[in-house]
């Protein structure tokens, strides 16, 4: 379970970085060269999703819970925005959904 969650976390970071770098280029006028590591990060994201031993749809559904929490962590650390009680509640609900799916995929 911990290995799966850690893999989901690293996968989410790759996806977020792969989307954040083009955002910097478009919104903040960063160098177009930031698109190269963005592409590499998104390619790594896709590859990491293939490392899970469950059906792809189930992996994507479970991954979503960790993605939500990782995005909120990004919001706090990178964007400097304080999380609200709604953010925390949403993260808890998303993680509960992920947990139910991951525990269940070992039993089917």
From Swiss-Prot:
What is the membrane topology listed in the Swiss-Prot or TrEMBL record?
A: Multi-pass membrane protein
Q: What is any Pfam family matched here?
A: UPF0060
InterPro entries annotated for this entry?
UPF0060
Q: Which SUPFAM superfamilies match?
A: Multidrug resistance efflux transporter EmrE
Cytoplasmic topological domain: 27-30, 82-84
Q: Does the keyword RNA-binding apply?
A: no
Indicate whether Transmembrane helix appears among the record's keywords: yes
GO cellular component terms, alphabetically, are: plasma membrane
Segments on the Periplasmic side according to the record's topology features: 1-5, 52-60, 106-108
What are the alphabetically sorted keywords of the record?
A: Cell inner membrane, Cell membrane, Membrane, Transmembrane, Transmembrane helix
Show the stretches that span the lipid bilayer.
Answer: 6-26, 31-51, 61-81, 85-105
Q: Which cell locations does it reside in?
A: Cell inner membrane
Question: Which NCBIfam families did the record assign?
Answer: PRK02237.1 (NF002586)
Protein family (similarity comment) = Belongs to the UPF0060 family.
What name has this protein been given in UniProt?
UPF0060 membrane protein YnfA
